[in-house]
Amino acid sequence: GGAGSCTGWPISQARGNYVARAAANFRFFADHARLATAEVLPMDSGHHAYTRFEPAGVVAAIAPWNFPLMLETWKIAPALAWGNTVVLKPAEDTILGRLAI
């Protein structure tokens, strides 16, 4: 248990900036998702170009063993924020705390 086992770092470092920065990744990408809008773009030829937001669907995220929490949130947060389902595959060497995310 505890912050150290969840991050793979000594508790003193995990309680510092590490977990807070990982949480900030979710906040950043949640705010970024408001850009997911449909638009009508006029073109010179009298036509219009239409954009449409659609999630990709299922996103596979493969995370390495080093710096696990931060690298996982960099992959998970944008995929979830833009409406996708995420399947996370942590490295076999990664601590078991990764399965809780």
Residue ranges of model-derived segments:
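N-terminal Rossmann-like NAD(P)+-binding subdomain of aldehyde/semialdehyde dehydrogenases
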Residues: G1-H47
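Rossmann-like NAD(P) dinucleotide-binding subdomain of oxidoreductase/dehydrogenase enzymes
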Residues: A38-I101
